């Protein structure tokens, strides 16, 4: 397990929310943040604080993305026509590691990034080892033949902990997924409320 994967519950504690809906999240047992001072009652956040929190939560959800990478994604969303907040969600959900996670090929977003980085996945028959690779509607994502018997894959597919959203069509017997369409915010099965509009406000200050 990588350091970034082992930090996933730190993100939950920092946010004070079980952002992936995981049964073992420590925030299911307590309502305070990490560290010895976490039990102190938190004061009301300023508008800036609320916006920053929304940004940190969205960054954390997709594997604790680096600020530079997240900002670049936002800038692209802002350049595109339409609602920037919806564009942002669409771009994040189009990431290869996000699709591998949504398809239930692996149990966590962190595991999805590592799985892709280690070369276990193909897109339209071509091996891709970049988690941030952006998929297009109609792309076919498949677990490579030699990787289909990995324990992490078999265990994840067997779990009924989360459903596959309807914008991804999956055949778990063949370990193949099709990215049917780019989703909207309302389509995405977040375990907690995500507020991308606050992220837009944060970067528009």
Curated annotation (Swiss-Prot):
GO terms for cellular component: small ribosomal subunit. Gene3D superfamilies: Ribosomal Protein S4 Delta 41, Chain A, domain 1, RNA-binding S4 domain. Residues 94-157 form the S4 RNA-binding domain. Keywords: Ribonucleoprotein, Ribosomal protein, RNA-binding, rRNA-binding. The keyword Transport does not apply. It holds the Pfam family S4. Residues 1-46 are annotated as: Disordered. Part of the 30S ribosomal subunit. Contacts protein S5. The interaction surface between S4 and S5 is involved in control of translational fidelity. One of the primary rRNA binding proteins, it binds directly to 16S rRNA where it nucleates assembly of the body of the 30S subunit. With S5 and S12 plays an important role in translational accuracy. This is Small ribosomal subunit protein uS4. It comes from Rhizobium rhizogenes (strain K84 / ATCC BAA-868).
């Amino acid at each position: 397990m990588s350091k970034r994967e082992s930090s996933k519950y730190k993100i939950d504690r920092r946010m004070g929310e079980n952002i992936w809906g995981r049964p073992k999240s420590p925030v299911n047992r307590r309502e305070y943040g990490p560290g010895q001072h976490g039990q102190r009652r938190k004061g009301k956040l300023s508008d800036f604080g609320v916006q920053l929190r929304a940004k940190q939560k969205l960054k954390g959800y997709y594997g604790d993305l680096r600020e530079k990478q997240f900002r670049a994604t936002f800038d692209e969303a802002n350049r595109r026509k339409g609602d920037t907040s919806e564009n942002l969600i669409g771009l994040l959900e189009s990431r290869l590691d996000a699709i591998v996670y949504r398809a239930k090929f692996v149990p966590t977003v962190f595991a999805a990034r590592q799985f892709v980085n280690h070369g276990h996945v193909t897109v339209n028959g071509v091996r891709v080892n970049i988690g941030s690779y952006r998929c297009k509607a109609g792309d076919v994502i498949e677990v490579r033949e030699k990787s289909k018997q990995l324990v992490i894959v078999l265990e994840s597919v067997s779990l009924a902990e989360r459903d596959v959203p309807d914008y991804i069509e999956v055949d778990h017997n063949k370990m193949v997924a099709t990215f049917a369409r780019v989703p909207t915010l309302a389509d995405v099965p977040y375990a907690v409320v995500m507020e991308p509009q606050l992220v837009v406000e944060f970067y528009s200050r």
